[in-house]
Amino acid sequence: MGVYRIRVSTGDSKYAGSNNEVYLWLVGQHGEASLGKLLRPCRDSEAEFKVDVSEYLGPLLFVRVQKWHYLTDDAWFCNWISVKGPGDQGSEYMFPCYRWVQGRSILSLPEGTGCTVVEDSQGLFRKHREEELEERRSLYRWGNWKDGSILNVAAASISDLPVDQRFREDKRIEFEASQVIGVMDTVVNFPINTVTCWKSLDDFNCVFKSGHTKMAERVRNSWKEDAFFGYQFLNGANPMVLKRSTCLPARLVFPPGMEKLQAQLNKELQKGTLFEADFFLLDGIKANVILCSQQYLAAPLVMLKLMPDGQLLPIAIQLELPKTGSTPPPIFTPSDPPMDWLLAKCWVRSSDLQLHELQAHLLRGHLMAEVFAVATMRCLPSVHPVFKLLVPHLLYTMEINVRARSDLISERGFFDKAMSTGGGGHLDLLKQAGAFLTYCSLCPPDDLAERGLLDIETCFYAKDALRLWQIMNRYVVGMFNLHYKTDKAVQDDYELQSWCREITDIGLQGAQDRGFPTSLQSRAQACYFITMCIFTCTAQHSSVHLGQLDWFYWVPNAPCTMRLPPPTTKEATMEKLMATLPNPNQSTLQINVVWLLGRRQAVMVPLGQHSEEHFPNPEAKAVLKKFREELAALDKEIEIRNKSLDIPYEYLRPSMVENSVAI
């Protein structure tokens, strides 16, 4: 009993405030008090007032909120509510919200310290946990967009999503304005699009318009160079294909007369400097038909050697897998006529674009993050510390993925209009890539070791990914161990175990055979798994997202489709090259989508810089502060390093990494 001081914070996005009246209740261990009608919340503001409570409440557990409307339901975005108990020595309690309050239902906000089911030994939050998860499971249902792929949220359109998963107004306006600009560019380029074919490589300058980056300019000027071609496997938009060779690939059948090449490859293999990039997943994928015109795919293998100065140079390209009973496919080398070698590299770059967008970017980034998001909402109540740890890294993921399924990979979407894997092939490729998606491949310490990339001084992706993983893991361990003091506490947390099973058994459709756990038996294992989730939603997505505008804007460096079959002889000409590369319409579509996806966003939260305080207690704040300090130190290190590099690598700079999959 006594006078309580109450503060209420409203979000800063457009329409976050409300003209409706808000009622509050305080719920303590020993009683409950109705505070009545207290405010009409204003956007980006903090309201403060005092209330004299006659009941003895004891330690506070919840604040209950109800928004009352008469004619119009004007939703309110509540950040948090703070309550300070009576007297100068009264305890201050923080109740995080960070969600929309709408309708007339009563919303219960638990005190923000967070607790597991093991910590909640008195069952003070048990009923709240059960009721919240029951409601969430009806709101967040699993969907199956396409048979054979991992599951997604059940939402055919944005309006089907729970309101808390939709873009807030500032994000929506910025995103949709960019879409309008892309449409206008297509209209402006209509005269170019009516040209049926480019005549020379210089013609691609017609669509290389303003808005490109300095790196895109460098790509345009250097894309033909072998060292530049090899660099992209180390530090380009898709650093996920390259691995160190431990033997010559079985598919590498040498045609007669290539004994010297075979000897060279064996020599590099013995030295440990032989690397490969195998696009075998594209083998057997049906190519698209665009406007009645057949498109083509290849499944290249690239063999590369690591030079003493750190350059990675291609030494052989095989465009297709050998077929039983057929003549071995040709192997292209740098000693071939320049046009043959350039055409072979263009085929590799086109194949890399297909795998980048579907495997590295969509599957390993967007779709995995969506599985984590849906499982988290279904299995972890808002009072759970792992929910609090994860939720900033799940912001906007569901909406951006619904938009992708509606606009990019849908029937008559961008893939069908411009990509050689469109028309259904992209769906088959997603399924095949999913079958090769392992737990270890999502964890840089395991993935980089398995691919033999840890000791390459010029592989800045590997260096930065490993550093970021280590920083994230220390952050996760620090937060996790505040609530889990023993391995048994992990084993006994049935909410945490349910969340893990939901990801592996349900979302990933039974991925135990690929190393994903169905239970968490120790603090170390749980922290590793949670680190994987956060890394996937942040750093890994950024590593393959941020480079799109740099590496894919110059169309010949990443052709969205190929209009002639892969060459079987070495007699390429400029006419054949131009007839193979995308036509003007396809090129325009490519750069517009690349710009939309790859542009730097006005509304962007850097890694670890979320303003939401889901952990208000001092111990957790100290862990977050240390995390941010380590990120800032790494950011400065990368900035200094990049000044000495010919090509700066910035895709894993913490200040550039998005805090969630939001674009």
From Swiss-Prot:
* Residues reported to bind Fe cation: 361, 366, 541, 545, 663
Identify the SUPFAM superfamilies for this entry: Lipase/lipooxygenase domain (PLAT/LH2 domain), Lipoxigenase
Reaction(s) catalysed by this chain's protein: (5Z,8Z,11Z,14Z)-eicosatetraenoate + O2 = (12S)-hydroperoxy-(5Z,8Z,10E,14Z)-eicosatetraenoate; (5Z,8Z,11Z,14Z)-eicosatetraenoate + O2 = (15S)-hydroperoxy-(5Z,8Z,11Z,13E)-eicosatetraenoate; (9Z,12Z)-octadecadienoate + O2 = (13S)-hydroperoxy-(9Z,11E)-octadecadienoate; (12S)-hydroperoxy-(5Z,8Z,10E,14Z)-eicosatetraenoate = (8S)-hydroxy-(11S,12S)-epoxy-(5Z,9E,14Z)-eicosatrienoate
Please name the Pfam families in this protein's record: Lipoxygenase (PF00305), PLAT (PF01477)
First and last residue of the signal peptide: none
Q: Where in the cell is it found?
A: Cytoplasm, Cytosol; Cell membrane; Lipid droplet
- Function summary: Non-heme iron-containing dioxygenase that catalyzes the stereo-specific peroxidation of free and esterified polyunsaturated fatty acids generating a spectrum of bioactive lipid mediators. It inserts peroxyl groups at C12 or C15 of arachidonate ((5Z,8Z,11Z,14Z)-eicosatetraenoate) producing both 12-hydroperoxyeicosatetraenoate/12-HPETE and 15-hydroperoxyeicosatetraenoate/15-HPETE. It may then act on 12-HPETE to produce hepoxilins, which may show pro-inflammatory properties. Can also peroxidize linoleate ((9Z,12Z)-octadecadienoate) to 13-hydroperoxyoctadecadienoate.
Its recorded name reads Polyunsaturated fatty acid lipoxygenase ALOX15
- Organism lineage string: Eukaryota, Metazoa, Chordata, Craniata, Vertebrata
Gene that specifies this protein: Alox15
